[in-house]
Regions:
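Walker A/P-loop
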Residues: 132-153
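Conserved strand-helix element at the start of the C-terminal RecA-like helicase core
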Residues: 159-169, 320-329, 334-361
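Conserved interdomain linker/interface between the two RecA-like ATPase lobes of SF2 helicase motors
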Residues: 287-345
Length: 502
């Protein structure tokens, strides 16, 4: 039996039995639930998914990655390329010999060279990408994913598409290829050959094309995606775990590449939808270890207290906590002290509104501009300038949403992270905490500062991220006194808010 490998693998329906078809469809059908514990307590758990499940609020949907399609006059079972080796083995185990006709593109471009230096572990990771061609490189934050990706592209010298969900991450790749005011170019690629592409002409005329996944969301974007489907030998996807996994999967399932690599520091997702991306791109092919600094824990009590009864909307809890004026004052005063000790401070928030208030208060109390807003609303040149200035320690403090400050922002000089957000997301916590642990000569000992609110939900969230991420992964240093205080804070249930004279 001959199967065709393109943007997907197409299996002729006539050559497999209905039983094999159903087995493949079952294997590529995924159901998602908000909380597994709720299902375990349900009397219908042994029969899920059934009609009862589909009407339950805990059921978050079903995704079928295998589908029947018609090409010309023939019918095929279409399956994702990432899962195709397993599907082919399933077919061969039933006595059917499979021959794969590979129709991946082969578009070489004028060669360009990598001229940077490698850190420990990077060469092995590049070899793994060359060997497996498809899959996910699990690399911790600050391990040099852009360096490894750029080196891979140079080695192959083929037309390349680099996808990400945020422009800042793409600019990191561009900076690695062609340099910037603060970073030398690590390749000899002509800057005219790389571009953040938006139009068909852009994609056609550049050898290294950068694009946000949002470029392909609209009807016009879908048409553009269809037009460029077979143009790229090499497709790199940065931080595959961050955006909506189903959106990433939809786009990746429509692209035909020979080398397709996803980068992620934390492939696991709280909603478990990483399985969708892994079936499209491929499994984890290599896991890196990286050198990072050891954080020290500092504690600050905010005096903020909140008592709730019954079910309270999450947004209400976040809004009340982040906009509390006395709490903002506490954060601002502490930021000024940490900056005075030489730290470059990152302050993430869940909502946009508090950002302006925190920045204003820090600068008011300091009597000069120390803090800057870092949000998606900033104009692109200004965002780029802020990143450069923070690297040079011209900017002492950035305040922004946790999504923007947690992933893809390369500021090695950042040395102090404020844990102020109501969050219990383990993959995101790992990304966020790693931001301040990049080794750099002359950098202060990195600090992760916990702001302690007398608020039950806040304690539970912080406890979860502290014991399941910070302690086992980053092995922080904490004084006996602070350790006793933090453990007491986690244990306490009664309101015992204490105010420091800040």
């Amino acid at each position: 039996m001959k199967v065709v490998k393109r943007e997907a693998v197409f299996i002729p329906i006539k050559d497999i039995t209905p039983q094999i078809q159903e087995r493949i469809k079952d294997k590529l059908t995924f159901n998602f639930f908000a909380k597994e514990k709720i299902c375990e307590e349900c009397e219908w758990v042994a029969e899920r998914v059934n009609d009862v499940c589909e009407s339950c609020a805990n059921f978050k949907g079903q995704y079928q990655l295998a589908s029947q399609v018609k090409l010309g006059s023939s019918k095929y079972l279409k399956v994702p390329v990432g899962s195709s080796p397993e599907i082919i083995r399933l077919i061969e185990d039933r006595g059917i010999e499979v021959e794969v006709r590979d129709m991946s593109p082969s578009t070489k471009v004028r060669p360009f060279k990598f001229k940077g230096k490698y850190r420990p572990g990077q060469v092995e990771a590049i070899k793994a990408m060359l060997k497996f061609k498809r899959g996910i490189l699990k690399a911790p934050p600050r391990s040099g994913k852009t360096v490894m990706g750029s080196s891979l592209v140079c080695h192959l010298s083929r037309k390349t598409l680099i996808l990400a969900s945020q422009r800042d991450w793409l600019m990191g790749f561009k900076e690695t290829f062609v340099g910037s005011d603060t970073q030398p170019a690590l390749t000899d690629l002509d800057p005219k050959r790389i571009k953040l592409c938006k139009t068909l002409e852009d994609f056609k005329t550049h050898d290294v094309c950068l694009a946000t996944v949002q470029t392909f969301y609209s009807p016009g974007g879908e048409k553009l995606l269809k037009a460029i489907r077979d143009w790229f030998d090499v497709i790199l996807v940065d931080e595959v775990h961050t955006s909506a996994a189903d959106k990433y999967a939809q786009i990746m399932a429509k692209l035909n590449g020979r080398y397709v690599i996803g980068f992620s520091g934390t492939p696991d997702r709280k909603d478990t939808k990483e399985v969708l991306v892994e079936n499209i791109i491929g499994p984890i092919i290599h896991e890196m270890k990286t050198e990072r600094m050891q954080p020290h824990i500092r504690l600050t009590r905010t005096g903020y207290s909140k008592t709730t009864k019954g079910q309270v909307p999450w947004a209400y809890l976040v809004r009340g906590m982040e906009n509390d004026k006395k709490r903002i004052d506490c954060i601002a005063k502490q930021a000024i002290r940490d900056i005075a000790e030489g730290h470059m401070v990152l302050i993430p928030t869940a909502q946009v509104k508090p950002i302006k208030r925190i920045v204003q208060r820090i600068n008011e109390l300091a009597g000069k501009t120390l803090a800057y807003e870092f949000t998606g609303g900033l104009k692109k040149p200004l965002r780029d300038q802020y990143i450069q200035d923070a690297r040079d320690y011209k900017i002492k403090c950035l305040v922004g949403t946790q999504k923007i400050l947690s992933v893809g922002i390369n500021i090695p000089r950042a040395s102090c992270l404020y844990e102020t957000v109501l969050s219990s997301n383990l993959p995101n916590a790992q990304q966020r905490m790693a931001r301040v642990l990049t080794p750099m000569e002359g950098k202060p000992t990195p600090i992760i500062r916990f702001f302690l609110d007398d608020f039950g939900v806040r304690k539970n969230c912080m406890r979860n991220e502290y014991y399941r991420v910070l302690v086992p992964i980053f092995k922080p240093v904490i004084s006996p006194k602070d350790k006793e205080m933090l453990e007491s804070y986690f244990r306490s249930k009664e309101s015992n808010a204490q105010r420091f004279d800040l």
